[in-house]
């Protein structure tokens, strides 16, 4: 059985990675995504 905190950590890491990717996309291609 997985620990609840392990799940939270895993989800938090995935969300953080996705957020970083989104920010990088916005910075790299400023107004090409309308």
Swiss-Prot record:
The protein's matches in InterPro entries, at most eight in alphabetical order, are given as: Dermaseptin_dom
Pfam families membership: DD_K
Q: Does Nucleotide-binding count among this protein's keywords?
A: no
Task: Give the GO terms filed under biological process for this record.
Answer: defense response
Q: Which UniProt keywords apply?
A: Amphibian defense peptide, Antimicrobial, Cleavage on pair of basic residues, Secreted
| Superkingdom of the source species | Eukaryota
Q: Describe, from its UniProt entry, the tissues in which this protein is expressed.
A: Expressed by the skin glands.
Q: Main site of residence?
A: secreted
Q: Where in the cell is it found?
A: Secreted
Task: Please provide one cellular component term from the Gene Ontology annotations of this protein.
Answer: extracellular region
State what this protein does.
Has antimicrobial activity.
Family the entry assigns:
Belongs to the frog skin active peptide (FSAP) family. Cruzioseptin subfamily.
Stated name of the protein: Cruzioseptin-5
Q: Name the source organism.
A: Cruziohyla calcarifer
């Amino acid at each position: 059985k997985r620990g609840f905190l392990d799940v939270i950590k895993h989800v938090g890491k995935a969300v953080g990675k996705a957020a970083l990717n989104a920010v990088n996309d916005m910075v790299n291609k400023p107004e090409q995504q309308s």
